[in-house]
Amino acid sequence: MYPLRFDHIDLRVRSVPEVEAFYDLLMPAFGWVRKSYAHVDAEGEWHDVDAEHPCNAVEYFAPSDGVRPPCFIGFIEDAGMQTSRTRIAFALGSPLELIEWEPRLREFGARCIERSEDMDGYPALFFEDPAGTRLELCARKVTGPEAGQP
């Protein structure tokens, strides 16, 4: 049995066009290169885009591990959406990568970019997409039993 992992995230945004250009740069930089479009109705059902179902969602897919389907993030348009304090964090391989990412985030159009107050203890960059969705890049260290320590 595999450890549980997330399959997908449905993230509501006020406007897909408001954030799409940002995620078109960010997600491929993470290696999430496959993109698709969909229509999500009021009941949350997903449909292919057609004359009856106009595009109101964009999805970015991570590469498959060859065993399970690829996970994805779907940005779904909801004009009444208010941003929340929820944050999605993506893991980097090392704290040195954070230094490389900071200017890239600015180039992509990220807002409110801040370094962790404790870059040694918790190396991370906090930022927002153009709609105010809170995101994070972190490079947590392996400690405790995972690192062979008591």
What are these regions (language model features)?
Residues 10-67:
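Core segments of cupin and vicinal oxygen chelate
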Residues 20-21, 99, 135:
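Alpha-helical elements of the RecA-like P-loop NTPase motor core of helicases
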Residues 70-74:
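A short, structured beta-strand/loop element
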Residues 1-20, 31, 87-88, 143-150:
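N-terminal beta-strand motif that seeds the catalytic metal site of vicinal oxygen chelate
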Residues 24, 28, 99-102, 106:
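Class I S-adenosyl-L-methionine
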Residues 75-79, 139-142:
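Acetyl-CoA-dependent GNAT
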Residues 2, 6-14, 78-150:
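Vicinal oxygen chelate
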